[in-house]
A protein has these predicted regions:
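Long, contiguous binding/interaction regions
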Residues: 2, 20-22, 91, 169, ...
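A conserved beta-strand-loop-helix scaffold within acyl/acetyltransferase catalytic domains
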Residues: 50-107
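Acyl-donor-binding surface of acyltransferase catalytic domains
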Residues: 1-29
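Conserved acetyl-CoA-binding loop of GNAT-fold acetyltransferases
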Residues: 3-6, 152-161
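Conserved acetyl-CoA-binding loop-helix of GNAT-fold acetyltransferases
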Residues: 104-107, 113-130, 149-153
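Short amphipathic alpha-helix that is part of the acyltransferase structural core
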Residues: 25-57, 175-179
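Conserved GNAT acetyl-CoA-binding A-motif
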Residues: 128-140
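Conserved beta-strand-loop-alpha-helix junction that forms the acyl-donor binding cleft
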Residues: 138-148, 163-171
Length: 179
């Protein structure tokens, strides 16, 4: 891993979730769960992710090109028939066997503040368990405080050991969250 003190050179922070039981997936009224479908999935993923991350990414280059790509791993939440949140229950060879990877969580701005990030992530954690992954991890940026709060609510904990910068960065993140 890189060791430069320059923020752009630092790796994303990592959060891990152990084998503890998952909460039930009981979506709020008016929210539906959909699995990726070829007819609408790529455009819906690009719209949500590009809007949330404020950059342009191609579904084919970022997701479909990965060996982990399977339609059932990309989950959407919808309201009134339109996708408003997405996340992926991914796999990465660099992580130990039995570990799922929570990937590209995005909620459209007009749907924020409804805990949809929580619900789409929980749906992905359930998908990981169906695939035999009892552990989960994710990578995120220090400034994504609302997302980090959601990950804590889902039972994720900070990884303090995988990079020398993590202890100080997590101390700052936790102070910003007032935890």
């Amino acid at each position: 891993m890189r060791t430069s003190a320059n923020k752009q050179d630092l790796p994303s922070v990592i959060m891990r979730r152990g084998p503890q039981p998952l909460p039930l997936l009981e979506l709020p009224p008016g929210v539906g769960l959909r699995v990726f479908e070829e007819a609408w999935g790529p455009a819906a993923w690009e719209h949500a992710v590009n809007t949330a991350f404020e950059r342009s990414m191609s579904f084919d280059e970022v997701m479909r090109a990965e060996p982990a790509f399977r339609p059932e791993r990309i989950l959407f939440l919808e309201q009134e028939g339109s996708p408003v949140a997405v996340a992926a229950a991914w796999q990465r060879d660099k992580w130990p066997p039995g570990t799922g990877y929570l990937h590209y969580v995005a909620v459209l701005p007009g749907a924020r503040g409804q805990s949809l990030g929580y619900w789409v992530c929980l749906a992905c954690l359930h998908q990981m368990r169906r695939e035999g992954n009892i552990l989960a991890l994710l990578e995120t940026q220090d400034e994504r405080l609302p997302a980090i709060k959601t990950y804590f609510k889902l039972g994720f904990s900070p990884d303090l050991t995988s990079h020398e910068s993590y202890p100080a960065r997590w101390e700052k993140i936790l102070a910003q969250l007032r935890w």
